Design a protein with these regions (language model features):
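Bacterial N-terminal signal peptides that target proteins for export
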Residues: 1-11
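Short, low-complexity, Pro/Ser/Thr/Gly-rich segments in the mature regions of secreted, periplasmic
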Residues: 110-125
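C-terminal segment of classical bacterial N-terminal signal peptides
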Residues: 15-24
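N-terminal secretory signal peptides
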Residues: 26-75, 85
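Short acidic, gly/pro-rich beta-turn/loop elements at beta-sheet edges
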Residues: 71, 105, 118-120
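SH3/SH3-like beta-barrel superfamily modules
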Residues: 28, 37, 73-113
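N-terminal start and proteolytic maturation junction detector
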Residues: 13-16, 50, 103
Length: 125
C-alpha cells in the first residue's frame, strides 16, 4: 500500500469519526486546548501561505502546538502540499491538508521547520 493510500485511509477515517460526533480532541489533555490560529500567539497570515512538506520522513499532525497533543494516525509525507494559516514564534504552523484524490481534508498543527513556503493561496493584491 502506498503512502498516499495510507494517508487517504487515515483521513477518511478521521472524517467519518468527526461526522459521528467523536471528536479527535475528546480525550486529549487540557494542555491540548491551547493556542488557536488567529490568537495573539499565532497571528493569521493574510492571504494564507501555500507550503510543501520537506525532508524524508512523515510529519505528524497535532491538535494544538504542543508535542504532547498528537492526532494519532494523522500525518503528511514529503512533497504533500498544505495551506498554512498561522505560525507561532516557537516553531508551530496551523495548517490544512486537502487530499487531492479524495477531497477529504484535515486541519491541525505541524512543526514549521518541515515546511517550505511555495507562495500564497488566494488572489494577489
Amino acid at each position: 500500500m502506498s503512502d498516499k493510500s495510507i494517508l487517504a485511509s487515515i483521513l477518511c477515517s478521521a472524517m467519518i469519526l468527526g461526522s459521528l460526533g467523536a471528536s479527535v480532541h475528546a480525550q486529549t489533555p487540557s494542555s491540548c486546548k491551547g493556542t488557536h490560529a488567529g490568537a495573539k500567539g499565532a497571528p493569521l497570515f493574510s492571504p494564507p501561505l501555500a507550503s510543501v512538506v520537506t525532508g524524508t520522513r512523515r510529519v505528524q499532525f497535532y491538535s494544538a502546538p504542543n508535542l504532547h497533543c498528537p492526532i494519532n494516525g494523522v500525518f503528511v509525507v514529503p512533497k504533500d502540499e498544505l495551506v498554512t494559516y498561522a505560525q507561532t514564534r516557537d516553531g508551530w504552523s496551523s495548517v490544512m491538508y486537502a487530499n487531492p484524490t479524495t477531497g477529504n481534508n484535515v486541519s491541525g498543527w505541524v512543526r514549521s521547520a518541515r515546511l517550505k513556503q511555495a507562495g500564497t493561496v488566494g488572489p494577489k493584491q
